[in-house]
Amino acid sequence: MMMSRRIQTAALVAALMIPAAASAQMRRGGPRGGPPFGGSLNNPPLADSEAEKRILDVAAQVERYLSVPPEDGRLIRILTEAAGAKRAVEIGTSTGYSGLWFALALQKTGGTLTTFEYDPGRAATARENFRKAGVEKIVTVIVGDAHDTVKQLAGPVDIVFIDADKPGYRDYLDKVLPLVRPGGLILAHNISGRESNPEYVDAVAGNPALETILVNGQMAVTLKKR
């Protein structure tokens, strides 16, 4: 079990390094001064099954209402699948875009997503998008104030994604952290710039049981070490 978790952690670290390495390579102009490398990495992902194609098709339709950039959605998918996640939690469903990226991974790992949304209209739209994508059986949408409804959760949880009211990030962290398993991940969106919550940053940066890295300039990825 311990070796398996070490392998998973190594895979996650590699997944985090790939975007940064590719970006640096493109800025340098490619190996040995050759043509720029990595342009094709900006293309949409290729589906390896009809189930994936269905999810990706719906995600492409939802993009105009997206709450996270596509590259962050792909990061969610990579981290979730690399972790072999069985239980994923999302605080801030919106219209379901990021949830679809979770679903791409979870239909491979055999996992489920519980996602919390404050607005009933957005929750209804998300449910319809999950139905169109054929993933409604692995996604549960809970409507209400997540500061209260998240108390329904029981552990262990493998990965959490927080993309809701920014002043509430610290409270969400305090509620979900005890539920996250050792080796689990907490992702927090819009963590830098004007929208950032200093209390959240201080909480993850000052906890010796956590290790945090900023990815794509706005996604804080936190590993729960123990």
Predicted features, each with a name:
Residues 6-13:
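N-terminal export leaders
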Residues 19-21:
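N-terminal signal peptide c-region/cleavage motif recognized by signal peptidases
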Residues 24-161, 166-187, 191-226:
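A short alpha-helical cap/connector motif
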